[in-house]
Amino acid sequence: MGKASHSSTAQDAVALFDSLRSAYSATPTTLKIIDLYIGFAVSTALIQVVYMAIVGSFPFNSFLSGVLSCIGTAVLAVCLRIQVNKENKEFKDLAPERAFADFVLCNLVLHMVIMNFLG
């Protein structure tokens, strides 16, 4: 009984990943690029946290600035992805150029705050 349950669970997991892969293959290239950017920003934040755990956090302002910059940029990129997605009905009247301009402006404000926090 346990082995049959395990194999059906494994088959369900494989079916789930196959369906996710096929659904994601239909995603437009622009959204995939934004997804890569989000993944890069989050992985950079994780690398900084691991580095801080191993080496230490002597200039704590620098550590906080780096992590908050990465996470803030990732959050802004998620907002950009939501606004640019054609299937999202909430932002159908918003031009992609306007969404990108908002993203750039918010990133400038975020990084000015981060630079101010550094001192």
UniProtKB/Swiss-Prot annotation:
- Functional summary from the UniProt entry: Subunit of the oligosaccharyl transferase (OST) complex that catalyzes the initial transfer of a defined glycan (Glc(3)Man(9)GlcNAc(2) in eukaryotes) from the lipid carrier dolichol-pyrophosphate to an asparagine residue within an Asn-X-Ser/Thr consensus motif in nascent polypeptide chains, the first step in protein N-glycosylation. N-glycosylation occurs cotranslationally and the complex associates with the Sec61 complex at the channel-forming translocon complex that mediates protein translocation across the endoplasmic reticulum (ER). All subunits are required for a maximal enzyme activity.
Name under which the protein is recorded: Dolichyl-diphosphooligosaccharide--protein glycosyltransferase subunit DAD1
Q: Name one Pfam family in it.
A: DAD
Q: How does it sit in the membrane?
A: Multi-pass membrane protein
UniProt keyword annotations, A-Z: Apoptosis, Endoplasmic reticulum, Membrane, Transmembrane, Transmembrane helix
Q: How does it assemble?
A: Component of the oligosaccharyltransferase (OST) complex.
What ranges are annotated Lumenal (topological domains)?
57-59
Q: Which family does it belong to?
A: Belongs to the DAD/OST2 family.
Q: Which species?
A: Malus domestica (Apple)
Q: In which pathway does it act?
A: Protein modification; protein glycosylation
Name the principal localization, coarsely classed. endoplasmic reticulum
Q: Which InterPro entries match?
A: DAD/Ost2
Q: Can you list the GO cellular component terms from the UniProt entry?
A: oligosaccharyltransferase complex
